[in-house]
C-alpha cells in the first residue's frame, strides 16, 4: 500500500516537502512544496523546465514532472518540519528514459525477471574543508599517515557524531565512522540494502553531510581529488545478489574459490569485461582521473586502482573479494551518481551472466609495488575522454543500460570534456610561455 504523503505530513507535523531528483551530472534538483499541496503533487508530480538541468532536454520540450516515490520519504532529522522524497522523472505521462532513477528502476526490474535481487552497500568518502573550499578545516590534521587518527576524528566529533546520530534515528544501522587516509577526510558506514534503497540513501547522505557541515560553518566535498598529494575520495561499492525473496545469497558457495558461486563469478566477469567503459559512469568527471592515475600520495598509497584486476582480501586491486558471497568494487569515486552507480553495476553484471563472462586470472600481489609485472591486464582510462570513448565503443554495455540514457550521457559528457579542453590553465602558461 502506497504511503499517503498528506497523512504523513499531518502525523509528523511536516510543513514542506523537498521533491528531489538527480540529473545526469549527479546534481540534486528539488522544489520545496508546502504540505497543503502535496496530495496533488503525489499524484501528478512537481513541474520543472527540463532544459534547466542536465538531462539532455531542450527549451522546446514540455514540462518535466518529478513524481515523488512515497516509499523514499525522509523527515529531515535536523529540520523536522521538512521532509525529503526522491522522485521519478516523467514527461507526457511517460518515464524520462535517461533520468538516473528511472534507469536504475528499469534494471532492478530486469534483474527481478531473471530471479535476482541485487543488494549493495556504499562507502562514500568526503573531506571537511573551509567554507571557501581552499584548505582542510582542521589546521592540526597534519600527520603523514592520518588514517584512523583518534585525535583528528574527535576534533570533528561535533560534525561526525551529529550525522551518525541522524542515521541512527533514520534506522540506517550505521556501524562505524573513521578518519580516512587523507588529512581532513572521513568515511561513515551504514548497513547494505536493496540497490534502489541504497541509491536513495546515498543521495540523501550527500545532502545531509553537506547540510550538517554548513551548519557548523564548514563545507563537505565528495570531489574525487580535491587536494594534490592527498588520497582522493572513493565510493567503494559492496555487491551481492540474492534470490527475489532476498533470503538466499546467489553469490555464496563455500565449495568455490573465495566463496564465490559460478553465477557470482560470471557477474564479476561482466564487471571485469566492461571495466574501461564502466569508468565513464563510476568516474564521471575530469577530476576523477587525477585520483585513478595519481602518483604516490603523502600517506604512501592512493587506495585507488589503475588496472583491471581482481583478488581476494587485498585492497590494491580494482575488485576485492573480502569474504564469501560478495565482492567490493573499488573503482567508483565520490563524484559518482548514486543511481547510475547501481545501474551500471547491474547492467554489467547481468550482461556478464548472460554471456557467461570469465573474470579472468586473479592476482595475489601488491599492485602498487608489483603491478608492473602484470602485462596482460587492461589499464583503466587515462582521462575522461578515454573513458567516454570506451563506453561509446562498448555496444553490449550501452544496450544493457539503455540506448536513450547512453546517447544523452555521452552527448553531455563530451560537451563537458570540450569545455575543459578550452579552459586555459596556469600549467600551460608556466610550461610554454618562454618556448
Swiss-Prot record:
Keywords: ATP-binding, Ligase, Magnesium, Metal-binding, Nitrogen fixation, Nucleotide-binding. Residues 100-435 form the GS catalytic domain. Mg(2+) 1 binds at residues 123, 236, 328. InterPro entries: Gln_synt_N, Gln_synt_N_sf, Gln_synth/guanido_kin_cat_dom, Gln_synth_cat_dom, Gln_synth_gly_rich_site, Glutamine_synthetase_typeIII. Pfam families: Gln-synt_C. Its EC number is 6.3.1.2. It catalyses: L-glutamate + NH4(+) + ATP = L-glutamine + ADP + phosphate + H(+). Its cofactor is Mg(2+). Mg(2+) 2 binds at residues 125, 180, 187. Binds 2 Mg(2+) ions per subunit. Catalyzes the ATP-dependent biosynthesis of glutamine from glutamate and ammonia. Homooctamer. This is Glutamine synthetase.
